[in-house]
Amino acid sequence: MPTLPDLRAGILGAWRTNNRVTTELIQRLPPALWDLSIPDVPRRTIRAIAAHLHNSRCSWLRTLGREHGIPTPARVDQRGVPPGKLVAALKRSSAGMEALLALGLDDERLWIAHFGETRRL
């Protein structure tokens, strides 16, 4: 079984990789595709789905991070956010999510509250 430092490094490393792949995909997406509708879901564009990722993170941060002092970034407009602004917003929400993950990994009280013991995975 991995020790706590291994678990912490693995989870935070996986988060950073996920965010990097997401932001690079958005940066490299051809502009012609940005506002295309998803087949059979005409109200959902690639822009809207990408913005939803950031806005969902904001919801998690507001719900779980506020009481721990983790700031919630501003949400973005799913219909109008330009790619560059979305990438900047994703970087802010990623930093918050990383702080939230670190909080959960580092706070023994949270482990006890959720798992009933201090034994780490």
Regions found by a protein language model. Give the residues of each.
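Aromatic-glycine hotspot motif
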Residues: 1-121
